[in-house]
């Protein structure tokens, strides 16, 4: 199914399709551009490219040529172009030592360029779960959307978007492990109930060292949570009803903000006479 950008993300009246892989090249002027004059898309959500798949693509291109031109835009530097879509094809022709590559030149803004790169990769379904989560978060930010609205535009369930975004709350070390395929997405999601980053990282190391499967990881999480419950809790001064309502309202509001894709750094401290919430929002 094809969706115009204007309908999907309100990017104006351009006839560009969100599904870049199916450009109608009959309406576009294809030009031969020097391979060395092209730079990667700075908004590319994919951080890892399989060398083996690039070689396979290069072999196909060597035999059949490039059926689908890459898409680029001009940069401020004279004679230089930035990729919008087709980075795997661009990488493949570099291994073939091609001097020029067929391309379509678009006059896209940063927002349009980022959106095309994100949507193209999401539709190909080759991103890692972390790359996919970052892509969703970026689209939410670029277009000021709710998770529900983004899910509707991408034809996905809201729970799918929410589950991916929750992965971004995990420590960087856990996210790196997903990218490197040291653990699966299900392993990572099993760590989320632990809440504390140090415990999540500790269990991550155990999962990798002992090659725990998802069920074993979930069982370890349950045991760690039970151990935490058994620890003696310091006596606290009782809260008034108004204080409890205020605290719950703040926590719910923070949760809603984080579920929208904004990564907050929050601290909750209890003092003798008051509760202090510290919220840091990255710029």
Swiss-Prot record:
<dbReference type="Pfam" id="PF02195">
    <property type="entry name" value="ParBc"/>
</dbReference>
<dbReference type="GO" id="GO:0005737">
    <property type="term" value="C:cytoplasm"/>
</dbReference>
<keyword id="KW-0238">DNA-binding</keyword>
<comment type="similarity">
    <text>Belongs to the ParB family.</text>
</comment>
<dbReference type="GO" id="GO:0007059">
    <property type="term" value="P:chromosome segregation"/>
</dbReference>
<dbReference type="InterPro" id="IPR036086">
    <property type="entry name" value="ParB/Sulfiredoxin_sf"/>
</dbReference>
<dbReference type="GO" id="GO:0045881">
    <property type="term" value="P:positive regulation of sporulation resulting in formation of a cellular spore"/>
</dbReference>
<dbReference type="GO" id="GO:0005694">
    <property type="term" value="C:chromosome"/>
</dbReference>
<protein>
    <recommendedName>
        <fullName>Nucleoid occlusion protein</fullName>
    </recommendedName>
</protein>
<dbReference type="InterPro" id="IPR003115">
    <property type="entry name" value="ParB/Sulfiredoxin_dom"/>
</dbReference>
<dbReference type="GO" id="GO:0009295">
    <property type="term" value="C:nucleoid"/>
</dbReference>
<keyword id="KW-0131">Cell cycle</keyword>
<dbReference type="InterPro" id="IPR050336">
    <property type="entry name" value="Chromosome_partition/occlusion"/>
</dbReference>
<feature type="DNA-binding region" description="H-T-H motif">
    <location>
        <begin position="148"/>
        <end position="167"/>
    </location>
</feature>
<dbReference type="Pfam" id="PF17762">
    <property type="entry name" value="HTH_ParB"/>
</dbReference>
<dbReference type="GO" id="GO:0003677">
    <property type="term" value="F:DNA binding"/>
</dbReference>
<keyword id="KW-0717">Septation</keyword>
<dbReference type="GO" id="GO:0000917">
    <property type="term" value="P:division septum assembly"/>
</dbReference>
<dbReference type="InterPro" id="IPR023705">
    <property type="entry name" value="Nucleoid_occlusion_protein"/>
</dbReference>
<keyword id="KW-0963">Cytoplasm</keyword>
<dbReference type="InterPro" id="IPR041468">
    <property type="entry name" value="HTH_ParB/Spo0J"/>
</dbReference>
<keyword id="KW-0132">Cell division</keyword>
<dbReference type="InterPro" id="IPR004437">
    <property type="entry name" value="ParB/RepB/Spo0J"/>
</dbReference>
<comment type="function">
    <text>Effects nucleoid occlusion by binding relatively nonspecifically to DNA and preventing the assembly of the division machinery in the vicinity of the nucleoid, especially under conditions that disturb the cell cycle. It helps to coordinate cell division and chromosome segregation by preventing the formation of the Z ring through the nucleoid, which would cause chromosome breakage.</text>
</comment>
């Amino acid at each position: 199914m094809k969706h115009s950008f204007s309908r999907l993300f309100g990017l104006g009246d351009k006839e560009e399709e969100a599904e870049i892989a199916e450009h109608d090249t009959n309406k576009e002027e294809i030009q031969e551009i020097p391979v060395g004059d092209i730079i990667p898309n700075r908004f590319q959500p994919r951080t890892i490219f399989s060398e083996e798949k690039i070689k396979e693509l290069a072999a196909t291109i060597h035999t059949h040529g490039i059926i689908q031109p890459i898409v680029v835009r001009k940069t401020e530097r004279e004679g230089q172009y930035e990729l919008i879509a087709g980075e795997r094809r661009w990488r493949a022709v570099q291994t073939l030592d091609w001097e020029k590559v067929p391309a379509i030149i678009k006059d896209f803004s940063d927002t349009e360029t980022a959106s095309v790169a994100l949507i193209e990769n999401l539709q190909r379904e080759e991103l890692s779960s972390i790359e996919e989560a970052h892509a969703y978060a970026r689209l939410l930010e670029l277009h000021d959307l709710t998770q529900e609205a983004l899910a509707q535009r991408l034809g996905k369930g809201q729970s799918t978007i929410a589950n991916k975004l929750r992965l971004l709350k995990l420590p960087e070390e856990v996210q790196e492990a997903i990218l490197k395929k040291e653990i699966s997405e299900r392993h990572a999601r099993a760590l989320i109930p632990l809440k504390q980053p140090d415990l999540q990282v500790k269990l991550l190391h155990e999962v990798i060292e002992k090659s725990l499967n998802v069920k074993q990881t979930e069982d370890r999480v349950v045991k760690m949570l039970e151990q935490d419950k058994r620890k003696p809790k310091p006596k606290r001064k009782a809260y008034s009803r108004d204080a409890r309502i205020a605290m719950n309202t703040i926590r719910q509001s923070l949760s809603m903000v984080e579920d929208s894709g904004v990564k907050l750094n929050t601290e909750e401290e209890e003092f003798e006479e008051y509760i202090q919430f510290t919220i840091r929002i990255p710029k």
